[in-house]
A protein has these predicted regions:
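N-terminal acidic, proline/glycine-rich, low-complexity intrinsically disordered segments
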Residues: 1-7
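Residues within the DNA-recognition helix of helix-turn-helix
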Residues: 67
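N-terminal helix-turn-helix DNA-binding core of bacterial DNA-binding proteins
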Residues: 22-63, 86-94
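Short, Lys/Arg-enriched N-terminal segment that forms or immediately precedes the first helix
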Residues: 8-28
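Beta-hairpin "wing" of winged helix-turn-helix
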Residues: 72-82, 89
Length: 112
């Protein structure tokens, strides 16, 4: 069994494995946008309104909303509305852990 994929995949057909690889590729593609990583960094402090994310990211509302929507649709962020204010929070802790791990590795490389 390959170290790349977990043991749970041992019973999958080649076609199903292709689906797994495609979904993993989509996940990393979603996170390959620096603005989305910045938004995740901001949301590590807890739930934030769109306006707060916009201010802290230093980006336009249209740009921030586009990225928040993409992350929400992917199941990485939770969204709730209170009156006219929309709040986002990290929902998928596993996705956050992947980002933290990669960021830690990059910081190691930068410091060495």
């Amino acid at each position: 069994m390959s170290k790349l994929v977990p043991p749970e995949t041992k019973d999958l057909s080649p076609a199903q494995m292709e689906q797994v690889f495609s979904k993993v590729s989509q996940f990393f593609s979603l996170l390959s946008e620096p603005s989305r990583l910045k938004i995740l960094f901001i949301l590590c402090d807890g739930e934030q309104s769109v306006n707060t994310v916009m201010e802290r990211a230093g980006s336009s509302q249209a740009n921030v909303s586009r990225h928040l929507t993409a992350l929400h649709r992917a199941g990485i962020l939770a969204r709730r509305k209170e009156g006219v204010t929309v709040y986002y929070a990290i929902e998928d802790e596993a996705s956050l852990e992947i980002c933290q791990s990669v960021c830690a590795r990059v910081v190691e490389k930068i410091k060495s």
